[in-house]
Amino acid sequence: MKALAKLERAPGLTLTRVKKPEVGHNDVMIRITRTAICGTDIHIWKWDDWAQKTIPVPMHVGHEYVGEIVEMGQEVRGFSIGDRVSGEGHITCGFCRNCRAGRRHLCRNTVGVGVNREGAFAEYLVIPAFNAFKIPPEISDDLAAIFDPFGNATHTALSFNLVGEDVLITGAGPIGIMAVAIAKHVGARNVVITDVNDYRLELARKMGATRAVNVSRETLRDVMRDLHMTEGFDVGLEMSGVPSAFTSMLEAMNHGGKIALLGIPPAQTAIDWTQVIFKGLEIKGIYGREMFETWYKMVAMLQSGLDLSPILTHRFAVDDYEKAFATMLSGESGKVILDWTV
């Protein structure tokens, strides 16, 4: 079958032919129709330090997808041939304490689709049936293909009550931009997002941001004054992994504020801990998606009017994958979709 793979320990990916995967007793085989390019795939493309330490070679990658079930193992229940599905990319052990307590997103033995095992940038993908998630007919293939990052945004944004709150989001990547729409959808008052990328800040405005701030030209203090915010932000969502962004967030938080961290900063990042201690801030690390509460919330929000369509900015046939990755690398895109049906 056709697949987009890392064949060499060097930058780039290669469109190649690989063996079609086999289906185990508890697995489903999905014929892929759409995939999306993730920031993780960009790390793999660039072959940076993280990728060199993490990604087996050779292996086809990718973990944002939608498709149709074409084969099932004999033990699979609850699915039918022809079901349209996406899937949870974190395959968990089912036996550790967190898994047995229903906290599978915290499994210490997680294996990532397209990271630690063969991925979705291929004509067919096999995953455990437990990880598959049915997509309602009213949700498009393009939207279903981004349920993985949409889930990251949902898990992060809904970690705290947002109704009537002032929310600061640092980092206007696709996940941060989707978090803007989620926060507004569930009732946040002011939603402010910061970055230095004007293209993506404009996308955030289209998604409902109260203010989209280029911090190279404008300060948060000035924005807060314009919005008549005298005490600070109630909730912070750190999506960038940039130390200076986290520092500015800490300074802008109200006493008793709550912060969810999804962005991954450098290992030895220093912060002013007095901001955390004296303000009584609550900080929560976020990893992946809650299985499968986050997925149900994603569907419910889309069915109740959440509009993510502005984030879907570019579409390419898979044969044009180099153009697709170049578009993502340019920084002037939202989510980039690869079509496996043409």
UniProtKB/Swiss-Prot annotation:
Biological or metabolic pathway of the protein: Amino-acid degradation; L-threonine degradation via oxydo-reductase pathway; glycine from L-threonine: step 1/2
Keywords recorded for this protein, A-Z: Cytoplasm, Metal-binding, NAD, Oxidoreductase, Zinc
GO terms of biological process kind: L-threonine catabolic process to glycine
Pfam families: ADH_N (PF08240), ADH_zinc_N (PF00107)
EC number: 1.1.1.103
Site (Important for catalytic activity for the proton relay mechanism but does not participate directly in the coordination of zinc atom): 148
Sites where the protein binds Zn(2+) 2: 93, 96, 99, 107
Free-text remark on how the cofactor is bound: Binds 2 Zn(2+) ions per subunit.
Catalytic activity line of the entry: L-threonine + NAD(+) = (2S)-2-amino-3-oxobutanoate + NADH + H(+)
Disulfide bonds: none
Names of required cofactors: Zn(2+)
Active site: 40, 43
Superkingdom of origin organism: Bacteria
Residues given in the record as NAD(+) binding sites: 175, 195, 200, 262-264, 286-287
InterPro entries cross-referenced by the UniProt entry: ADH-like_C, ADH-like_N, ADH_Zn_CS, GroES-like_sf, L-Threonine_3-DHase, NAD(P)-bd_dom_sf, PKS_ER, Zn_alcohol_dh
MF terms (GO), sorted A to Z: L-threonine 3-dehydrogenase activity; zinc ion binding
Chain residues that bind Zn(2+) 1: 38, 63-64
Localization: Cytoplasm
GO cellular component: cytoplasm
SMART domains tied to this protein: PKS_ER
Task of the protein: Catalyzes the NAD(+)-dependent oxidation of L-threonine to 2-amino-3-ketobutyrate.
Assembly and binders: Homotetramer.
Protein family per UniProt: Belongs to the zinc-containing alcohol dehydrogenase family.
Protein name: L-threonine 3-dehydrogenase
Organism: Paraburkholderia phymatum (strain DSM 17167 / CIP 108236 / LMG 21445 / STM815)
